[in-house]
Swiss-Prot record:
Expressed by the skin glands. It is found in: Secreted. Keywords: Amphibian defense peptide, Bradykinin receptor impairing toxin, G-protein coupled receptor impairing toxin, Secreted, Toxin. Belongs to the bradykinin-related peptide family. This is [Thr6]-bradykinin RA-11. GO terms for cellular component: extracellular region.
Length: 11
């Protein structure tokens, strides 16, 4: 996983 990866979309 790349750094700062998130399984949720941050809007």
């Amino acid at each position: 996983r790349p750094p700062g990866f998130t399984p949720f979309r941050i809007a």
